[in-house]
Structures are given as structure tokens and as C-alpha cells.
Amino acid sequence: MNSKFSVKFYEHKKLTDEIISEIIYVKSKQWKYSFDQHKKWIESNIKNEDIHVLLYSNNKIVAYSNLVSILVNFDGKQISCLGVGNVCASERSKGYGLELMTKVNEYLISNKKIGLLFCREVLLKFYTSLGWKQLQPKQYQIPLLIYEAMVFNLSRDFSLLEYNDKLF
């Protein structure tokens, strides 16, 4: 990892109001909602055990993602996975996303977890370059999904991935 960056993983229940405010600032660069709307989304969608991933540069949060505990069916077998959501950075073209996702990938590998993420088509090349695999529409059933689906750290073949919980 680049020495000018550091990454911290926080369980949601351990976040301070100050850190939540900093997260919302970074998220608002990507998604143009009000502070209160971002805060309400976090309160409604992130559980106490879910993880916030923060990339710091000069003691300032410059990129963010969250890891949410999810259950996914692979060919009818339910497996505990981590949903990777809200990947964003305070500025583009600074390498923040690369650093952040490199650490997310290391976390998934070291914790023996499969990662699932949803992204816009324009981001497929970025995530593929980091080892994520794009799922073809015939490989998954995810209601209301309007984005692309990708997996990471999946060592087995499967015919059908089913996920029926909230999008993250």
C-alpha cells in the first residue's frame, strides 16, 4: 500500500458522530443527497456489526466503502458473504479507489469471505482489474437490480447466484 495512505476498518457500532459526518461528506461527493438523507440511509441500512472502510490521507478521510453481512444462495446453498457498497472518493484520479479496494480485497481474502458488489457498467473495467468477476445475467437472480453484479474471492463454480435482500 502507498505509504501516504492508511486504511481503518470500523464496526458501525464503534463510529463516532464526527466520523459519520466525515463519511457523509465523502459520500456526498458521489451521491448528491442532503446530509440528513445520507445519515438516514446509514441508520436504516447499516447494522451494528457491518463494517465501514475508511481510506485516510493526511489524517483526512478521502475514500469510503462499507462491508455488509449478507446471505447469498449459490446453487441453493446459503453462504455468508460480504456486500461491498458505497465505494466512493472525495476526488477522482488520485488513486483513492484503487488503494481502498486493494485493502477491501485483502480483507475479504484474510477473512475467507466472498464479496458481492453492484456497479455501473462504466466501472466494470476498474473492478475487473482488481480481480472482481462480472456475473452474466443468466448467472444471477437479484430482484430490482439495475446495475452490474460482480463477485470476488469465489473459488468454486456455480450455475445460479440468488440474493433477495436489500441492495447495499
Range-by-range predicted roles:
Residues 88-92, 120:
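Residue-level recognition of the GNAT/N-acetyltransferase active site
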Residues 3-5, 80, 85, 113:
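Short amphipathic alpha-helical segments
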Residues 106-120:
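Conserved GNAT acetyl-CoA-binding A-motif
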Residues 12-88:
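A conserved beta-strand-loop-helix scaffold within acyl/acetyltransferase catalytic domains
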Residues 1-4, 8-13, 48-49, 118-168:
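Terminal substrate-recognition subdomain of acyl/acetyltransferases
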